Amino acid sequence: MMKRRSLIKAFALSATVVSMGFAWSAQAADTIKVGIMHSLSGTMAISETPLKDVALMTIDEINAKGGVLGKKLEPVVVDPASNWPLFAEKARQLLTQDKAAVVFGCWTSVSRKSVLPVFEELNGLLFYPVQYEGEEMSPNVFYTGAAPNQQAIPAVEYLMSEDGGSAKRFFLLGTDYVYPRTTNKILRAFLHSKGVADKDIEEVYTPFGYSDYQTIVSNIKKFAAGGKTAVVSTINGDSNVPFYKELANQGIKATDIPVVAFSVGEEELRGIDTKPLVGQLAAWNYFESIDNPTNAKFVADYRAYAKAHNLPNAATVVTNDPMEATYVGIHMWAQAVEKAGTTDADKVRAAMAGQTFKAPDGFTLTMDQTNHHLHKPVMIGEVEENGQFSVVWQTDKPVRAQPWSPYIAGNNKKPDHPVKTAQ
């Protein structure tokens, strides 16, 4: 039997631990935990690290104005390291151990698909800030990036137009995973509907982290000998750097073979001599070069944040589309929490419908009433010598997302509201 003195000691210790526990949980309740889940290492770090940085800046901005529901937001940053199964583990950790009220994260669709069952099982909320292939509408995700009809389809329509070079043949080049393959399936069906034959469509995929583009670029040149050709690039991550370097090495100019990219923005061009790429294209819903007061403040705030926090290459930081979508998403979530009066996922989900926010893209963006996607303007930009983009085409107003593409058979029977996807 335990001696009486030991018992008293043990009881005193457990009482201290319990009271410490209460103090900790009370302290934790003074803040609202917010998960930030982006790859800060591995092949996707080039693209995802700035999303973590802009998320922290946005949280600081909200906290400086008093936080949400009178509480400060407390960021919890995790690094899933471009490792797709690790994303699911980190998501579970954020929701169960860290008790995050919401998570802002992911870039690749394979990372989003990895975490989706976790968010649906635990009824967590994920804000996903990157353009993607559609074919998904989860009640546990808000998609603040573009669906194919808000990026891919308009970009290819532009390439086929006189202004875009009247392309007749299409070289679809992507990283080998769900986003490029599904997007290209949609684009192939779209091109068929416009009378483009399979012989005039080439599809090539490379692994994540791929760097030897010599043969592929040489094949693009051969394919282009058969008629006016455009390249549609869904290459993701740091592979973009060697791809664009190889285009320059082989003397491919935008006037000969235009390349439109869906995952290359200002950040990916930071490490490249952009002079040989002048005139090449990217389709997004925001560019840093957009001239309006809201964007001027967003860009200035981020530059100041980078300097104050000694971010790597702070003197040359840029903003881009997924950063803007992250910024908009965090602000919309904060507004929805204020409206709901709670961080409860079901109540916040309901409060998100119809939320609006004046975005740096120059438009007041609306979260759709039913489909969990943002209405977004579509823009096509040309690379300039300084690594920025000049907008050469854009819609005159935001476009409603079509997560279920009409170019995929059977989609017309799918509901226009979220349904759990994970089994």
Question: PLM features: residue spans?
Answer:
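Signal peptide-proximal N-terminal region
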Residues: 29, 53-75, 165, 193-198
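Extracytoplasmic "Venus flytrap"
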Residues: 35-54, 78-85, 107-110, 176-181, ...
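Extracellular/periplasmic Venus flytrap/periplasmic-binding protein
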Residues: 89, 140-250, 293, 297
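Periplasmic-binding protein-like
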Residues: 94-106, 127-129, 169-174, 226-237, ...
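Extracellular/periplasmic periplasmic-binding protein-like sensory domains
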Residues: 247-327, 338-341, 395-422
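Segments of small-molecule ligand-sensing domains
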Residues: 307-323, 332-402, 406-407, 419-423
